A protein has these predicted regions:
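His-enriched metal-coordination microenvironments in redox/metal-binding proteins
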Residues: 1-131
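Activation corresponds to long, low-complexity, non-globular regions
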Residues: 132-175
Length: 175
């Protein structure tokens, strides 16, 4: 889940970026993977249950771009529909950050390591079986529903460009 549309001011030692994602169905959370670049300082995943109770799922207080881990649960964690995943990232764009390529510049989201990212990978499985069996053909209704759900997620994340990605590449024989 990338989060865009923010600018880290030049010289700022502790800039905070926040995003929230609503869980739309019951899921089993399998793992999480924070991702930032050289100015990344800390990252937190916090879950708000439908009843308002909150739980910190992952806190990485000393993020290091060179040590990006995928944090896995020993047993999948059940998360009910309607829960909200609150994600917070902190960045150090100051001269005190020895990894900072240029503390005199404002920084925005971008693909280069000299840009920044506020990404929160989550890997999960639905609790309800999808009706997919290894080795059997995937029914058209499941493929169509997956395409629709993917477009909704991309639009919500401001990633979908219909002109660039029309799913014409997707066929039954796709790997």
């Amino acid at each position: 889940m990338p989060h865009r549309g923010w600018t880290i001011p030049a010289g700022h030692p502790n800039y905070e970026v926040n995003n929230t994602y609503e869980i739309e169905e019951d899921i089993f959370l399998l793992s999480m993977g924070p991702h930032m670049h050289y100015r990344g300082k800390a990252m937190r995943y916090e879950l708000e249950y439908p009843d308002g109770e909150r739980e910190v799922l992952l806190w990485v207080p000393d993020y290091d771009f060179n040590w990006q881990f995928l944090y896995e649960y020993e047993e999948p964690k059940f998360i009910p529909e309607g829960s909200k995943m609150h994600m917070s990232w902190w960045f150090d764009n100051s001269e005190a950050n020895r990894f900072n390529p240029d503390p005199s510049q404002d920084v925005v989201y971008g693909p280069e390591t000299t840009d920044e990212m506020a990404n929160a990978r989550i890997y999960y499985a639905p609790t309800t079986p999808r009706g997919l069996v290894v080795g059997e053909q995937i029914p058209d209704d499941i493929i169509n529903r997956a395409r629709e759900e993917d477009m909704i997620r991309r639009e919500r994340a401001d990633l979908f460009d219909p002109a660039a990605d029309d799913f014409s590449w997707l066929t039954e024989d796709s790997p």
